[in-house]
Amino acid sequence: MDRHRRIGAVAMVLIVAALASCGPFEFAGRANETARLHEQADAALARWAAAVAAAGGQQDFVPTEGMTGQVGDWEVDVGDNNKPALMAGLVESATQLPDDLPPKAEIRWNDGTTKTVPTISAAQALRDLRDEPESPCPECHPLRVNGARLSTATVQTSRGPATAPAWEFSLAGTHVKLTRIAIAAGDGPAVQPPPWDANNPSAGVRIDSATRTADGRQLTAWFTGAPDGAEKPCGEDYTAEAVESDLAVVIIVTAHSNPTPGGCTLVGAVRTATAALARPLGDRTVLDIMEGRPVPVQLAP
């Protein structure tokens, strides 16, 4: 009996020792990952500060998506050409577009705030549209613009959706119209993501958007994550923290996984995590930690 007790005691000591030896390594791994994420966030804040300085300190109007839009759907007989042609920037003018500058116009956000900005000519807007090709299409026929009028369009910005002045271009052979925000493309901050490194890819959870509380002291990040919480196999819970500067905020989202082994699906779901700020968000921009790009922020309902 004593022998059995001694064996059991030795086994228990070995188990405890094994668990103890794993603990520091696991803790160190998490600490290293946290330090890496904070370093990545600091680098994103530094790149944003440089971009704002290059833009003359302006970060009121920061689009978070392209400034080219489309009104209507392509007809069946032209869609196979026109959609890739637009993505390739193959748009030319079939008539002389005005190159004179229209009067200043107003950007209006959904929260009621406004900003008066200088606008660009129709000819310049078309040049800007062509200068942003997404993919080449050597076999496509160019779209031909046969008219332009100053209108408005909705654009996603770092402060949420905004209605902005826009040139609306009519096209030959289709009822579809193109829109281009009538504000110079280079007037706001333009930040480039860090170069891709296959041996050291960016860490963290990519943020799609965020909502803020009325007092601006909390940000809720919206992102794609595990469908279930950590109480289920393959599930994850998420926490968030904010790394702040005078110009921007980076949200770090940390996943807390269920360690139970099992087969997991690749299906994602919309998840959220909330971070508290040291001071109200104000006019600061919220950045994604993966690439340091601005994300749209709206007032929480």
Role assignments for model-derived ranges:
Residues 2-243, 248-272, 276, 285-301:
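Long, terminal "pre-/pro-" and other extracytoplasmic accessory regions
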